[in-house]
Amino acid sequence: MSNVFDGDSPTNLAEYSVSELSGSIKRTVETAFDQVRVRGEISGYRGPHSSGHAYFALKDDRARIDAVIWKGTFSRLKFRPEEGMEVIATGKVTTFPGSSKYQIVIETLEPAGAGALMALIEERKRKLGAEGLFDAARKKRLPFMPGVIGVVTSPTGAVIRDILHRISDRFPVHVLVWPVKVQGEGSGEEVANAIRGFNALEPSGTIPRPDVLIVARGGGSLEDLWSFNDEIVVRAAAESAIPLISAVGHETDWTLIDYAADVRAPTPTGAAEMAVPVKAELEAQAAGLAARLQGCMNRQMDQRRQSVRALMRALPSLDQLLALPRRRFDEAATGLGRGLELNTINKRRGFERVAAHLRPDLLAGRIAERRQTLNERMARAERMVERLIDRSKSRVDRAEAILASLPARLKTQTDRGRERLGNLSRHADTAVRHQLTRARSELSAQDRVLQSLSYKNVLKRGYAVIRDEDNRPVSQAAHLSAGMGIAIEFADGRVGAMTTEGGTPPAGAKKRSTKPAEPPKQGSLF
């Protein structure tokens, strides 16, 4: 300090160094403004610094003052500062001697009245609404009966207990709780991350993806609920692919997440009631529907029973149903017997007509051929009878299928008819087989007669057949002349011989022609 008694000094003012003056100002300001309340608009806010401190300014229409909130104080704020928000800051004013600047160190911060916050909410609401985040077309329907419910709320307090208790009472399901802070610094980010985290789960993963989400918080002041007005929370709710129920505060409390959610519940308990139905009511409804269904089925059964009775009255009796098939079967069986008998008679007559003109060896071959043909026809006749019987049985089976739904009385008549038809089938089969056996017996007898008429059987009894040089049988001595070569056929072979004299022909007998005779024409057995 200079000498105050120096005669050259124009005044008696004390002289300060820059440091002394800055320190004196600092002490004066901090003493005079140790605790002040300042109203102003937040300006230049960019969120907390990496150190955790927040730096911004408070301004009005004529002045501006720098402000700082230390990390410890910032974490205790009830709401998050935002650019343009009008607030009331409480703290002390201090200066920095090194730069000749002053600032307010904020100890508490509160909105400058509810009107300021509401104005900010309205401005944000208009902005997000213009982007379509609140459109009704984005809303999703809640599932009727979710299997898993995700809850985003504080893990402590009455809210989560009320939700779990209400869900357990109404319809117990699996509940996943994502614990978050519901107010204070960082609460908005935690709520948004929880919503996105639930949406990122795989439906078939180890932790199942919820079918519906509940974002809940208890009641509080506008500042307490401010996190749910945060833009990041609103966007996360609007982007959620899982239907979301907002249950923030009481019924009169509205936040921006309520507009972005698919459904707003007045309270957390109301959200639980919206998420699941009442199991007892569902059981009662199911019982009522079952009773109505049973009544409907009973009415349908009565109607069907009456229809069956009407059909039974209109349906002809079993005898009427089987009359035509039975008559056709009888006609076929009778016609078959008569046809076989007539055919056998005709064949016998034809055989008798041509038997005299047939040579035994050729006749035996023809008989074998005809026997084979007859056997084939008999086999075809048997197959035809079997097919006729099968068709009759098929008709009876179809009649049985129609009659199967009729009362027991009609079924008894069907059984009796089936038994009669079986007897008729067996009688017809027996009759046909008897006719075939008799025809075979007659044919065998005729074959034996034919064999007995063969000249070879006569030769076996000591007779012989004499044939001329042309191998023709000689039945009279007059047909031979002296010196003619002949063949004598015995039962075991032939021998040649020569006549020594000719026979004397009887009176009126024509001389035998020496012209070779034509072989006799073979007659046909059929």
UniProtKB/Swiss-Prot annotation:
Its EC number is 3.1.11.6. One of its GO terms (molecular function) is exodeoxyribonuclease VII activity. It catalyses: Exonucleolytic cleavage in either 5'- to 3'- or 3'- to 5'-direction to yield nucleoside 5'-phosphates. It is found in: Cytoplasm. One of its GO terms (cellular component) is cytoplasm. Signal peptide: none annotated. Residues 497-526 are annotated as: Disordered. One of its GO terms (biological process) is DNA catabolic process. Keywords: Cytoplasm, Exonuclease, Hydrolase, Nuclease. It is an enzyme of class 3 (hydrolase). InterPro entries: Exonuc_VII_L, Exonuc_VII_lsu_C, OB-fold_nuc-bd_dom. Heterooligomer composed of large and small subunits. Belongs to the XseA family. NCBIfam families: xseA. PANTHER family: EXODEOXYRIBONUCLEASE 7 LARGE SUBUNIT. Bidirectionally degrades single-stranded DNA into large acid-insoluble oligonucleotides, which are then degraded further into small acid-soluble oligonucleotides. This is Exodeoxyribonuclease 7 large subunit. The lineage of its organism: Bacteria, Pseudomonadati, Pseudomonadota, Alphaproteobacteria, Hyphomicrobiales. The gene is xseA.
